[in-house]
Design a protein with these regions (language model features):
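Conserved catalytic/switch belt of AAA+ P-loop NTPases
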Residues: 15-55, 77
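Residue-level signature of catalytic and energy-coupling elements of molecular machines
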Residues: 14, 33, 64, 92, ...
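AAA+/SF3 P-loop NTPase mechanochemical coupling elements
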Residues: 3-12, 28, 46-65, 115-117, ...
Length: 210
């Protein structure tokens, strides 16, 4: 609020589900959050460190969480829950092109002309080396590729090849970590195909013996 210079600002509470990890000798942070998010009390929220009341009644709070399982029920009762689906593979590729690749190139001192990652290569990385709703693992894999190319450029600048192929990806990262799941074209007697939804936003195929 001090940085925003406004009492009607928007405040982001990132990873609210991590509050439970602070329980113990350091106090209960969820008790303070209950008071902060309660419209009947937050007009005079008192910070025990500063020992002064703060009016939070005009603040719009937006909280994020990876899982609702570790958030106390009283805290969930004070918020409206909106479930956001994980990124699709196409969205991951778009995010990688616009943000992740430029970020890794800048971090390793390389330019766009020195490391060329096509959409097909990025899609292969997303499908074969990551299995998550977000893009953190994909960013790490892209970082591994860029670092390997930086070493190649430093060691052999005259024979360096800037275009990265799927073969280069598998040489640097190893074989695919995840194989694409497909339904058997020919049914097997006594085996049914099911679908599972994971908390990360991903799905999978299950072969169930009846």
């Amino acid at each position: 609020m001090r940085k925003a210079r406004a009492s009607d600002c928007v405040m982001l509470l990132d990873e609210l589900d991590k509050l439970s990890s602070g329980l113990g000798v350091h106090g209960d942070p969820t008790a303070a959050m209950l008071e902060v998010l309660d419209p009947e009390q937050n007009h005079a929220f008192k910070d025990h460190y500063l020992n002064v009341p703060v009016d939070l009644s005009r603040v719009i709070f937006i909280a994020t969480a990876n899982s609702l399982d570790t958030i106390p029920e009283p805290l969930l009762d004070r918020v409206d829950t909106v479930h956001v689906a994980g990124y699709t593979f196409d969205e991951k590729v778009a995010i990688a092109e616009r943000h992740l690749v430029p970020k890794q190139l800048d971090a390793h001192g390389l330019s766009n002309s020195q490391v060329k990652l096509s959409q097909d290569v990025l899609m292969h990385v997303a499908q074969s080396y990551t299995r998550e709703a977000g893009v953190r693992t994909m960013e790490r894999r892209i970082g591994d590729i860029v670092r390997a190319k930086a070493v190649e450029y430093a060691q052999s600048p005259n024979t360096y090849e800037s275009t990265i192929t799927i073969g280069d990806v598998e040489r640097i990262l190893g074989g695919p970590t995840y194989e694409p799941e497909v339904v058997d074209e020919v049914g097997v007697p006594g085996v049914a195909t099911g679908m599972a939804y994971q908390g990360s936003g991903m799905g999978s195929i299950l072969h169930i013996e009846c």
